[in-house]
Amino acid sequence: YGQFANLGDAAAAMRRLSTGFGPVPEDIWLELCSHMVRQLPDGALTLHYDPAIGEPIRAMTQEAAQAAEAVVWGLYDQIQAQVLLIRGMESDLLTEATAQAMTLRGPRARLMQWPGVGHAPTLTAPEHMREVADFLLGPLA
């Protein structure tokens, strides 16, 4: 993913790599990207996280994945607080079936799904922010 001369170049690259974030205005991309890069000694910018973060999960054997999933479900089932589950409908990680299961067990999450958004909703659309605020604060008139 390399280095970038400036924040605009980094934001453009992240936008190309992160189409699953959904529709995000340019000024928001710049703000998001400012938290995703770090400056190198020569002044160039580089990513502040490992873009290959998911590789170990993809490399798991089926048995290891099933064991890990059982542990995660066991922990999820113990949650006592209200849970808001936000799912971008284009997510390649959180399936519709898993999201629905999360509404039926454990804390019985309240599910919000947004079309045109992938696994990492940015919560920058006013209607998305309003829905989250309604969950956290109660409906505001």
Region spans (language model):
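Conserved alpha/beta-hydrolase catalytic His-Asp/Glu region
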Residues: 2-59
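Generic structural signal for secondary-structure transition and capping sites
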Residues: 19, 81-84, 141
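Conserved serine/cysteine hydrolase catalytic core
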Residues: 37-104, 113
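C-terminal alpha-helix
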Residues: 131-139
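Soluble or luminal CAZymes and related metallo-dependent hydrolases
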Residues: 2, 6, 64-71, 94, ...
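Conserved beta-strand segments of alpha/beta enzyme cores
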Residues: 108-110
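Catalytic histidine-centered segment of alpha/beta-hydrolase-like enzymes
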Residues: 114-129
